[in-house]
Amino acid sequence: MFWTFSFQGVTSLNFFARDYVNAPFNYTLFQSANPLYILLFAPLLALLWPWLSRRGRDPSTPRKFGIGILLVALSYGLVAAGIHFGTAADGKVGWWVLAGCYLLQTIGELALSPIGFGLVGLLAAKEETSFAMGGWFFGSALAYQLAGRIATLTTGSGTSAYSGIADYEHVYLWMFAAGTVVSLGYLLGAPQVRKLMHGVH
């Protein structure tokens, strides 16, 4: 789910930026937000996790997965709220809405992505490691496919700017709700999942 939602950054969010975001710069610059945020926040999280670990408060891997999904869900909640409450007379929202969306997604990615692939190698049986890693990449490919299908739902169905932007609001609100429910499942079920992880934190 995380990657399906995150991959909207190169699909529907890109078109949303082009058509419905009022920014003092070219909309293509939003594609630089994720790598810029990674450069800024990856060192901070690299310091945060060991700091929490020394105090016995480092979230377990299942909880980090839940945090990542929750943050990507909140990113679409932010966009939906920006559309609902912040659409100007020209039918566009402020650029800060999309900047905040990418920020939440990037922090979620940093919480989930670095440990996800490594976890496959740690938990898979030695003779099945290659197969398990292939499954990880297959999941990414499937996420791209689903992301494309979700992106098609955001295409404008009306003749005015407001009717078109409403499609984005509805889809992103649904993504916010679905992502929040799944993330809560991860967070609440983390203790049970950890028991199946053979001592891996």
Please describe what each predicted stretch is.
Residues 25-27:
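Short, positively charged loop/turn segments that connect secondary-structure elements
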Residues 193-201:
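Intrinsic disorder in cytosolic terminal tails and internal cytosolic loops
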Residues 17, 21-22:
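Extracytosolic (periplasmic/ER-lumenal) interhelical loops and adjacent juxtamembrane/interface segments
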Residues 2-5, 12-16, 29-191:
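Membrane-embedded alpha-helical bundles of multi-pass transporters/translocases
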